[in-house]
Amino acid sequence: MQRRPFDSEMELFRDSARKFFQQEIRPHGERWREANIVDREAFLKAGAQGYLCMWADEQYGGMGLKDFRYEQILIEENAFHGDSGYFISLHSRLVAPYLGNFGTDEQKQRFLPGAISGETILAVAMTEPDAGSDLAGMKSRAVEHDDHWVLNGSKTYISNGINADVVIVAAKTHPENPHGLTLF
């Protein structure tokens, strides 16, 4: 496997990210862990630095940055500085791509600009009280009704859920098929 080392531009980015995590994240980490919530201000500050959803297209306010090494730098610096709940990675690399890759144009226009700026906090709801993270054992159901869907079920351990503005919810749409899941 050929290693693609970080170039000088990436090292400048790392220096900037390191300063951000030292000044804006590390001092609050213990308080956030005790309270089980990351301050909304952290998302706004990360957005102001351009650290949220860097992959997103420029038309939504992103940088259109496809090189994962920049994200890798953020992940490394976040871990090195106390890992205050994965707020950047969960928001930008787990939840937002569902919108970016599968959302309608209207959903992208509505939600991505705020996710990029940090004004809109994203969460994902998959884990259930009786099924845990076993998605095949999920009990939540979604049934199509006229021009919308009706969701029924329970979720727990919703990462970023306590302060989320938008929550992606997984539910079974084809209960007979263990893979018959849809994200809403």
Model regions and ranges:
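A short core secondary-structure module
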Residues: 152-184
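Cytochrome P450 C-terminal beta-domain/meander region
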Residues: 134-152
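A short, Trp-centered hydrophobic/proline-enriched beta-strand micro-motif
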Residues: 118-126
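Internal helix-loop-helix
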Residues: 48-119, 160-166
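Residue-level signal for inorganic ion chemistry
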Residues: 10, 21, 74, 104, ...
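Short beta-strand-to-turn element immediately C-terminal to the catalytic PLP-Schiff-base lysine
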Residues: 101-103, 143, 169-172
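Short secondary-structure junction/hinge motifs that connect adjacent elements
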Residues: 27-49
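Intrinsic disorder at enzyme termini
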Residues: 1-9, 142
